[in-house]
């Protein structure tokens, strides 16, 4: 009888212990490792990803990687790709994947374009807002949302620009202690990140994207009036987009007062005056490039052109 009681007690103990053991919470690291393996195999919205993320967030509701994963899940799931025909030779700054001419010689250009499911994309934005509220000074999380908006809006990046302007204002007025999982966030890092979007919008080549380029460059100059990068951007806007040499020269001249050997401004002035056939002014900036050119090739080619204009052989 005593032996039977021992066995029964052992079974009761096992019944109380085993369920607890089965419910042991996985570590953050184990969730992260499993997530990375699954993403590598099937992408951010692959099979089983949503279930894993739900379990991860149930155990660790504020885990930054899990919150990011949830955003990426819905963003990826919202996307579908199609090859579409367009009349222009470039779309969003990209070359076509294929071009075909019909029997009359009319050429159509085919581009791979992403399209978005509205409901899923809206859910992705809600997840983005949640992770930003939880980690307001994780600058990479803000850029994830902005990148999503940029992809979604394509050549009319109104919401993306609004987010970027808000980010610029927040950075300048609140001076947050930005963090990033991979990089130290310095002033140069922030400037480079904003400039990357300026370049993207400029390359899109549409009226709306060019305006976005101007708005961002001007906003940065509102806070950093002597920033050479954005002064050059404004010069490029007036020269290449608006065909306004007078306004462009104002910005390039400001750059060269701050940095007399700035090759971007010098090269732009050479091109501007060569285009307008103003030989006198072109020679002025060729002399500067021959002296301050960053490469030997720049210096030599400028001198060759200068000699030609001066009638030398």
Range-by-range predicted roles:
Residues 21-111, 313:
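N-terminal leader/linker segments that initiate helical-solenoid repeat arrays
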């Amino acid at each position: 009888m005593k032996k039977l009681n021992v066995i029964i007690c052992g079974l009761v103990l096992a019944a109380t212990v085993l369920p607890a053991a089965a419910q042991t919470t996985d570590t953050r690291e184990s969730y992260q490792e499993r997530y990375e393996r699954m993403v590598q195999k099937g992408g951010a919205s692959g099979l089983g990803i949503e279930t894993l993320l739900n379990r991860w967030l149930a155990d660790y509701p504020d885990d930054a990687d899990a919150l990011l994963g949830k955003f990426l899940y819905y963003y990826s799931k919202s996307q579908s790709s199609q090859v579409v025909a367009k009349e222009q030779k470039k779309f969003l700054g990209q070359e076509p994947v294929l071009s075909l001419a019909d029997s009359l010689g009319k050429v159509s250009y085919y581009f791979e374009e992403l399209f978005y499911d509205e409901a899923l994309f809206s859910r992705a934005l809600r997840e983005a807002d949640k992770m930003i509220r939880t980690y307001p000074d994780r600058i990479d999380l803000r850029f994830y949302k902005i990148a999503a908006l940029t992809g979604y809006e394509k050549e009319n990046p109104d919401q993306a620009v609004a987010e970027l302007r808000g980010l610029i204002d927040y950075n300048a007025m609140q001076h947050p202690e930005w963090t990033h999982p991979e990089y130290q966030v310095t002033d140069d890092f922030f400037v480079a990140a904003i400039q990357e979007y300026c370049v993207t919008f400029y390359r899109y080549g549409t009226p709306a994207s060019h305006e976005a380029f101007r708005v961002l460059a001007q906003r940065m100059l509102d806070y950093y009036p002597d920033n050479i990068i954005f002064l050059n951007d404004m010069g490029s806007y007036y020269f290449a987009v608006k065909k306004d040499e007078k306004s462009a020269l104002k910005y390039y001249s400001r750059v060269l007062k701050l940095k007399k050997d700035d090759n971007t401004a010098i090269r732009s002035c050479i091109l501007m005056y060569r285009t307008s056939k103003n030989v006198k002014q072109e020679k002025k900036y060729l002399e500067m490039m021959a002296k301050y050119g960053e490469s030997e090739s720049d210096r030599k080619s400028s001198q060759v052109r200068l000699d030609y204009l001066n009638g030398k052989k």
